[in-house]
UniProtKB/Swiss-Prot annotation:
This is Sterol 14-alpha demethylase. Glycans are attached at N32, N332. It is an enzyme of class 1 (oxidoreductase). It is found in: Endoplasmic reticulum membrane. Gene3D superfamilies: Cytochrome P450. It comes from Aspergillus flavus (strain ATCC 200026 / FGSC A1120 / IAM 13836 / NRRL 3357 / JCM 12722 / SRRC 167). Its EC number is 1.14.14.154. Belongs to the cytochrome P450 family. InterPro entries: CYP450_sterol_14alpha_dmase, Cyt_P450, Cyt_P450_CS, Cyt_P450_E_grp-IV, Cyt_P450_sf. Pfam families: p450.
Length: 513
């Protein structure tokens, strides 16, 4: 058989498959009234994957116009049911454990990165205990102690990094913020011993491990691809670094160092069944803490600096807010070192962070596997167990319905619009401390329900100290001829600005005010 004939048959087969697929979709809509509408697509298996992957929010808003808040699309062969709006957030993110499951969705992606027997590679009851263990580093006293550590890391970086050599220059801000935030997360959440190991080798390991979060690993987490080989080697090396620290302490009889850090805390922890936390799990929790503490902060701090560079007047407003509200007891009347209590007097700093989180949440989709058929209240729909549920809290955050002129970055909007992420009447305890479910709010930058980010207070504090410190020392502006901010890069699980994203910086004449 000649190649032209083979090509003709292949084309006919492809057309026939598409025709059958379109016919199936037509019959599905006509005959199956208990399923949400299926987003039209030409190619089976691929479905809407490309549109969703390139521009998830554009995809969500487009589908909402056609199908309403509830619809199903095909994501690499997997029926994925989206439920938008505050009711959708409540339905998915506050679903019962017996009905929805995060572990089955995320474990294939996260386990090779974080390690076994932690986070999504263990029963939810065990994860809750692990969250209790790490609250040591997230207590009020710990947060207060983190402030000078974070401030010092930022000041040291601005003083010594080649990115900020001299009195002015240009910088690829996502690259710089990635370095700053790994240092701040390491210093505050990991302790002095680990921070001292954040060398060039560790940075390379972190980068290789981070590449494990590429979206293809949802489908092929164990494929022998180059980035997966680097991921596995980086995980093994990083785990050995933590294990060496633990063994060194045990051999020296120093299980409880004079200055208790997170590793020392975890070495004392015991599960409810009486089992001490194994060293392997300590290492894996430490890896998780480092990556979780750095990821969102890196992306959001980059967006903050890009937004400030696009509106230099706001940079000066922030600086003047510090001069007007903080003590000036430093040398020559300069601003004093930052303290935790200072941020109660810096509302614009908080609003800049809040507004940037609203527009630039680093995770656009939150997924849950359906475990039991789920009736959707107020609709004829029943979601079958073959589906994955998808919540997109960022959709309400980007909707004019809740935030007038929603696509504009305006920190001052929060002066008249109360933050709705915490409702005192919506408090629940999932086993690791009382917190707001948050599912009824249109603003959920850290998720909601039992999987709401436990480290959001640290994230806010980390960002606030970074922003306040950088504003004290630097002015920012866009490069000549540039306006606005870069587009969003959705190629990774954690979205961020398209790289490189360069801005201009200028050092202030007085170092601290």
């Amino acid at each position: 058989m000649s190649w032209p004939r083979i090509g003709a048959y292949a084309l006919l087969a492809f057309v026939a498959i598409m025709a059958l697929n379109v016919t199936y979709q037509f019959l599905f809509r006509m005959l199956n009234k208990t399923r949400p509408p299926l987003v039209f697509h030409w190619i089976p298996f691929i479905g809407s994957t490309i549109h969703y992957g390139m521009d998830p929010y554009g995809f969500f808003f487009s589908c909402r116009e056609k199908y309403g808040d509830i619809f199903t699309f095909i994501l690499l062969g997997r029926p994925t049911t989206v439920y938008l709006g505050t009711q959708g957030n409540e339905f998915i993110l506050n679903g019962k454990l017996k009905d929805v499951n995060a572990e089955e969705v995320y474990s294939p992606l996260t386990t090779p990165v974080f390690g076994s027997d932690v986070v999504y590679d263990c029963p939810n009851s065990k994860l809750i205990e692990q969250k209790k263990f790490i609250k040591f580093g997230l207590s009020q006293a710990a947060l207060e102690a983190h402030v000078p550590l974070i401030e010092k890391e930022v000041e040291d970086y601005l003083a010594m990094s080649p990115n900020f050599h001299g009195t002015s220059g240009e910088v690829d801000i996502p690259a710089a913020m990635a370095e700053i935030t790994i240092f701040t997360a390491g210093s505050a959440l990991q302790g002095e011993e680990v921070r001292s190991k954040l060398t060039t080798e560790f940075a390379v390991l972190y980068h290789d491990l981070d590449k494990g979060f590429t979206p293809i690993n949802f489908m092929l987490p164990w494929a022998p691809l180059p980035h997966n080989k680097k991921r596995d080697a980086a995980h093994a090396r990083m785990r050995s670094i933590y294990i060496d620290i633990i063994n060194k302490r045990r051999n020296a009889g120093d299980n409880v160092p004079e200055k208790l850090d997170m590793i020392g805390n975890l070495m004392q922890c015991t599960y409810k069944n009486g089992q001490p936390l194994p060293d392997k799990e300590i290492a894996h929790i430490m890896i998780t803490l480092l990556m979780a503490g750095q990821h969102s902060s890196s992306s959001i701090s980059s967006w903050i600096m890009l937004r400030l560079a696009s509106q230099p007047a706001v940079v000066e407003e922030l600086y003047q807010e510090q001069l007007a509200n903080l003590e000036r007891t430093g040398p020559n009347g300069s601003l004093a070192p930052l303290q935790y209590k200072d941020f109660d007097n810096l509302p614009l700093h908080q609003n800049v962070i809040r507004e940037t989180l609203r527009l630039h949440s680093s995770i656009h989709s939150l997924l849950r596997k359906v475990k039991n058929p789920l009736p959707v209240p107020g609709t004829p729909y029943v979601i079958p167990t073959s589906h994955v549920l998808l919540a997109a809290p960022g959709v309400t955050a980007l909707s004019d319905e809740y935030f007038p002129n929603a696509m504009a970055w305006d920190p001052h909007r929060w002066e008249t619009q109360a933050p709705q992420e915490n409702n005192k009447d919506d408090i629940v305890d999932y086993g690791y401390g009382a917190m707001s479910k948050g599912t009824s709010s249109p603003y959920l930058p850290f998720g909601a329900g039992r999987h709401r980010c436990i480290g959001e207070k640290f994230a806010y504090l980390n960002l606030a100290v970074i922003v306040a410190t950088m504003v004290r020392h630097l002015r920012f502006s866009n490069l000549d001829g540039q306006t606005g901010v870069p587009d969003t890069d959705y190629s990774s699980l954690f979205s961020g600005p398209m790289k490189p994203a360069r801005i201009r910086w200028e050092r202030r004449a007085a170092k601290s005010g």
